[in-house]
Amino acid sequence: MDANKQKALELAMKQIDKQFGKGSLVKLSDKDIEPIAAIPTGSFGLDLALGIGGIPKGRITEIYGPESSGKTTLALSIIAQAQKDGGVAAFIDAEHALDVIYAKHIGVDVDNLLVSQPDYGEQALEIVETLARSGAVDIIVIDSVAALTPKAEIEGNMGDAQVGVQARLMSQALRKLTAAIHKMNTTVVFINQIRMKIGMMGYGSPETTTGGNALKFYSSVRLDVRRIATLKQADKEVGNRVKVKVVKNKVAPPFRIAEFDIMFGKGISREGELLDYGVKLDIIDKSGAWFSYGATRLGQGKENAKEYLKSHPELAQEIEQKIKDALGVELSHMIEAIEKDEDELNLKGE
């Protein structure tokens, strides 16, 4: 840069610092760039799919899917993981449907969980903003966007047309929230529902999420949660097999998929993931219906093997460490492959 431009830039930076405060504009070389911190999800398969070990701190995450697919369970699992690391969590129960006993079974410290059941959407989002600006709360979960009913709609008559009111409310709230949560490093998770597009014909998905497009744009991560199978034990339904697709990811490559079991009354099955990844990585041997780890027979059938691992935590921990080591090697190979592809593209571009 020539001397005149350098001088003009320095003057502009001084003026900006004077007007907006020191550090309003800095060179990246003068600033320490730290890796993106994350809150684990409770599923190490999903943590791997997210690329950074969980959902990013200080950002917005959207979890959406059909009813009874496991959205709230996943969100509560994230809260439990944040609390384990000493974090403060808040749950904005716009649906007025929080099951405290289930949350406790999942691992949530319900005694220290902040809960609000707002009367209307504006109140809910004001509470979220106040908590975020306080800097004292690490994670806020809003359940759900569809239940954030604008005050005008509540006070109006049944059948009154309220076109786009909720979308405008969300757009305004997210504009205000984004800067606050980034500055205070507060993680905000919105749970959302699916609706069918009216008059949808031809190509594209007929599904959409509620609350307009603003949340899609402001979210750093979007997770599509689907129930793909019902788990049974002796003809009794005991849980669901769930598939989560990382539809959007601003902090790592998107479109990765994770599958795990959600057990009724218990939440995400850690033992189920140990068996799935253990078999996939040849750490656990599966012969017919039998699961074995070295000379140790874990059980006949997945549910029995899961129970064995649950009653032998030291063995489960040993298997988990081997899986993480194997996945770490696999991930490093993936990163090397991506970097190699990028180098080749750069060479072609030159």
From Swiss-Prot:
Record PANTHER family: MITOCHONDRIAL DNA REPAIR PROTEIN RECA HOMOLOG-RELATED, RECA
Entry-linked PROSITE patterns: RECA_1 (PS00321), RECA_2 (PS50162), RECA_3 (PS50163)
Organism of origin: Nautilia profundicola (strain ATCC BAA-1463 / DSM 18972 / AmH)
Keyword tRNA processing appears in the UniProt entry: no
Binding positions for ATP per the UniProt entry: G65, P66, E67, S68, S69, G70, K71, T72
UniProt protein name: Protein RecA
UniProt entry keywords in alphabetical sequence: ATP-binding, Cytoplasm, DNA damage, DNA recombination, DNA repair, DNA-binding, Nucleotide-binding, SOS response
Record-stated family: Belongs to the RecA family.
Keyword Cytoplasm: yes
One GO location term (cellular component): cytosol
Function, as annotated: Can catalyze the hydrolysis of ATP in the presence of single-stranded DNA, the ATP-dependent uptake of single-stranded DNA by duplex DNA, and the ATP-dependent hybridization of homologous single-stranded DNAs. It interacts with LexA causing its activation and leading to its autocatalytic cleavage.
Gene3D superfamilies the UniProt entry points to: P-loop containing nucleotide triphosphate hydrolases
Biological processes per GO annotation: DNA recombination; DNA repair; SOS response
Subcellular location: Cytoplasm
Pfam families linked: RecA, RecA_C
GO MF terms, alphabetically ordered: ATP binding; ATP hydrolysis activity; ATP-dependent DNA damage sensor activity; damaged DNA binding; single-stranded DNA binding
